[in-house]
Amino acid sequence: MHIPQWTVTALLKLTRANRAYLDPAAARKRIAKRALLPQPIVPRFFPGKTQVRIKVTYSAGQYIYVLVPNDQQPRGAFVYVHGGGWVNQIAPQHWQLAAEMATTTGRAVLLPIYPLIPFGTAAQVIPSIGRITLAAKEKFGEVALGGDSAGGQIALSAALEIRKTATMPIVLISPALDATFSNPHIPAAQQADPWLGVPGCKVFLEEWAASTPLTDPKVSPLLAPATELASLGPVTIFTGTADIFNPDAHLLAHKIAAEGGHYDLVEEPSGLHVYPLLPTRAGAAARAQICALMRTH
């Protein structure tokens, strides 16, 4: 069952979902609240839960949940880094996407539970995601890497870190790409975005960066040299136009193309932030496209 996107937009506005992203003070309160009251990791139910087997391992300083299809040996792996503004825990929508990917592609889907701010930092997490990805490649033979929002930033930064050792297909959903927010088209995108806001994102990113400069590719993968971005495996970017991260998605595609790299930019007109995770018709189509992509790589 799909719901119209306008109902999601209305709900976001009604609940003031962007409060912590528009107001720096509210962003700091969110960090303090999450530190004191951590969110649950595994939901009691999510669509597709009964179709997969779930186990948990511990590696590179993180718990990693592994979803594999029932009664099948996995063929390859997908390391998926959840989003949440570097401050929010993995959500049921991430679990639903992971289950759908596992059952329709036959891959093992790995969900690293990385430390969030104020405890986790880019310098700590990026190398560990790289190690987890390389270990998955060694175990399963083929590996893809992806993530949404903050998780997209982490995934792309990790791919840059390990590019000289291994490359793989990369899937980015509404990725955060540049912590400096210097793209001149972002203010216009902000007017259309009912979910995110630059002021709060800057607070979260400054906490995430810690002592790492905001311009470092560990924090802002878009600012890596174009030659390095183009040397990665094929990059598929899903982005909606009602998202403050949309302008940087175009810049990423441009930088990859300028050096002859392989990319695909999938843009949803009026699409919300992380629209492939939403229970809309456009979201379902994007999830199907992601799964089809994973079957062909």
Where do the model's predicted regions map?
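A glycine/proline-hinged amphipathic helix-loop "lid/cap" segment
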Residues: M1-N70
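Alpha/beta-hydrolase superfamily serine-hydrolase fold, recognizing
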Residues: G61-Y65, D71-H297
